[in-house]
Amino acid sequence: MSRIESLTRARIDRSKEQATKTREKEKMKEAKDARYTNGHLFTTISVSGMTMCYACNKSITAKEALICPTCNVTIHNRCKDTLANCTKVKQKQQKAALLRNNTALQSVSLRSKTTTRERPTSAIYPSDSFRQSLLGSRRGLSSLSLAKSVSTTNIAGHFNDESPLGLRQILSQSTDSLNMRNRTLSVESLIDEGVEVFYNELMSDFEMDEKDFEADSWSLAVDSSFLQQHKKEVMKKQDVIYELIQTELHHVRTLKIMTRLFRTGMLEELQMEPEVVQGLFPCVDELSDIHTRFLNQLLERRRQALCPGSTRNFVIHRLGDLLISQFSGSNAEQMRKTYSEFCSRHTKALKLYKELYARDKRFQQFIRKMTRSAVLKRHGVQECILLVTQRITKYPVLINRILQNSHGVEEEYQDLASALGLVKELLSNVDQDVHELEKEARLQEIYNRMDPRAQTPVPGKGPFGRDELLRRKLIHEGCLLWKTATGRFKDVLLLLMTDVLVFLQEKDQKYIFTSLDKPSVVSLQNLIVRDIANQAKGMFLISSGPPEMYEVHAASRDDRTTWIRVIQQSVRLCPSREDFPLIETEDKAYLRRIKTKLQQKNQALVELLQKNVELFAEMVHFQALKAGFVGMPPPALPRGLFRLESFESLRGERLLKDALREVEGLKDLLLGPCVDLPMTSREPALPLDSDSGSCPGVTANGEARTFNGSIELCRADSDSSQKDRNGNQLRSPQEEVLQPLINLYGLLHGLQAVVVQQERLMEALFPEGPERWEKLSRANSRDGEAGRAAVASVTPEKQATELALLQRQHTLLQEELRRCQRLGEERATEAGSLEARLRESEQARALLEREAEEIRRQLAALGQNEPLPAEAPWARRPLDPRRRSLPAGDALYLSFNPPQPSRGHDRLDLPVTVRSLHRPFDDREAQELGSPEDRLQDSSDPDTGSEEEVSSRLSPPHSPRDFTRMQDIPEETESRDGEPTASES
């Protein structure tokens, strides 16, 4: 056993030693790799917190850092891979290469370490295009060969064909060693020696303006004597205007740096992909054009405001018109589109820049050398992107400050106020567009991360796939906790979309639909959101189809409040299922896309027609000016013809009437108001002139007189000026014709747009219209036989379609007939029931009349002191149907007994319950009315009066409320003094 233990112990020791040696080798290898990186000989040193890293320009907070004694560079340990090659090692390699060729090329001057680096012109500017642009393309190997030939001439002078071949080979090798170096070295030298020159060339258009705006404010830019002539309010206003122009100039400079320095260098010098560069600098060309045009307008206004004989002193009194022009109309729409695109991609651009800077050494050194120049100080890529993003937010502040100091001129104040409103509206629209674009990008990101096969069943609708997400807009999204039926919480990603709520889970870095006990897609139709009373972060989602209740919890109380608010807003704006189905099939999606494209094409066609009208008006106006009508104003273009959103745009009848009215006006101008145009089926014949016997504007041979390709309008004595009775200058016939002609042209094109829109609408509504396709095939066929063949080919299909339509109509008519028959039967049954009810009511009426007659006889007998029968006929009176329907008084009504006459008394006694209730009333009534005999003697018509009085006294209460009050009163069994009860009598 001791031997086995010793062998085991020895084996363990050997494994430990081997592991220790392996770790030491790995450490030595890592140290060696760390020491020799890109030619640097790094050593580990201890530094203080104030030492800056050469690679990332950040302080070195770690205790240990790396330093290269060759080039004296101190960096982080993690930044060693991003550092460029060691410059000293490069210089040694270059010097060794030159020394090897020194025996064959004595004219080559060596570079020393202490002297300034000098390179041949071809090495600095390797191509002709780069002489014009600092960062031009090298054009591959052809540029290298060109650089090689030029450098050969520069180094060795002029050699003829008789020069030794070996010498030419040595020259070739030496020039190759100069030109085929690392590309990064070329970039360094190019940028070091040409950034300032190229920047000056770039800003040459605004060189004088930059000098004029070098001062910090207008008060410092103008002369002191000129400054003292103005009030304090004027000085403040001019300072703000000066700041506006100065910052606009700086903004244009920033855009030019982005476009002409950074972007051009990345494309041509670094040979980066255009898509990558476009991702870094989106829409910079459009932004540069917009702000350059605005800056030129501001500078022109400044030049107009200069004092005579001075290039510095100026006072700008009017600026509101320029601001309104810049922030309204097409300019505002262009700014909205470009800034929305740029600001929405701002985050992606910065992320892409950081990724490129971290992984690409050439890109890193390019940026570092570019920003090292004095002219590009504080103008790196990140700073430029941020400055462009923030520029549009500066306009409201500047215009508001100008407005506060412009109380003198009312018109200028109104213009500035309008401009301020336009700028705020533009900024709000840009914010909204940026928010929508960010939501679209986020939705696309979620869509890309979802499993392509992910689906979830929707009860009664079918499977809901990830393609359904792209049909909708993302309104809000966030991570929530879903409480399951078992009481456990699940992390879910909740998407609030146009008409649904979608629950997603993350699995293997992909999103899938939640597979829990409830559907993961909830419709917003009739959705109810309620917060949980005892929980600050929880809320209930109660859906109606299918009826389910979800309990979810947000991260905080504010987050829950935000969710409740946006969900309630979305529920109110949720579209109906007829307009927006929950799940769309492929056919419906295809039709929807086709309809969307059709609408876009219609819009493009309408815009082309509108542009056509504008060009026609411009052409006619130019011809009129060329004909000698110098003072003629440009004609007014017809507005509202091509606006698809207006209700009047689709009124073709109105357009036709307007066009006919314009034609009538032209006829009156050309032929006179008393001449009527005969309307024929083919060609309208013009009436003959009474003097010449020919048509106006028509020669003897029937040809129209033309001038410069247009019909010559007849005018009377055009040379002499025409005036009215008041001496006012009259408009010539050409001027009178010009505006109606423009109106007619615009109306006809508007009518064409209406026809196109209506045809597209009919195609969308009735895709199977055979007659229309037949007409179109006839109209579009160039050959008659081909047209007839097309019609013949469509005939069977037409017949089949017509047969199907007739069958469908027959089926619909049969269904309508059956429905009418059922309706007639129902009406007959209802009429029979009404007749039965009428007969019953007549029988009840006859019975009531007989009872009333019997009561009259009894009352007459009562008046003669005749005793009533024990059972009066009206005691057997059936219950009134209306009384049966009373819910609370049925029992009381059934227990009601009519009064019985008591012998020996001159009054009627009521039952106990009713007497006790109406006792005060009975006493008062007895005193007023007296005995029945007195009433019979005083009454002229005993039947009529007694019946009404007795019925009013003896009838039961008229409403359920009276019965309720009667039931609430306890029954009294005591009778009055000297009055026997009903039972005793």
Curated annotation (Swiss-Prot):
Region described as Disordered: 1-32, 890-909, 918-985
Chain positions with Phosphoserine modification: 109, 122, 129, 133, 137, 143, 151, 163, 172, 174, 177, 646, 649, 692, 710, 781, 885, 895, 931, 939-940, 946, 951-952, 955, 959
Residues that bear Phosphotyrosine: 893
PTM annotation: Phosphorylation of Ser-885 by PAK1 induces binding to protein YWHAZ, promoting its relocation to microtubules and the inhibition of its activity. Phosphorylated by AURKA and CDK1 during mitosis, which negatively regulates its activity. Phosphorylation by MAPK1 or MAPK3 increases nucleotide exchange activity. Phosphorylation by PAK4 releases GEF-H1 from the microtubules. Phosphorylated on serine, threonine and tyrosine residues in a RIPK2-dependent manner.
Protein's cellular compartments: Cytoplasm, Cytoskeleton; Cytoplasm; Cell junction, Tight junction; Golgi apparatus
GO cellular component: bicellular tight junction; cytoplasm; cytoplasmic vesicle; cytoskeleton; dendritic shaft; Golgi apparatus; microtubule; neuronal cell body
PANTHER family: AGAP007712-PA, RHO GUANINE NUCLEOTIDE EXCHANGE FACTOR 2
Protein name: Rho guanine nucleotide exchange factor 2
Organism: Mus musculus (Mouse)
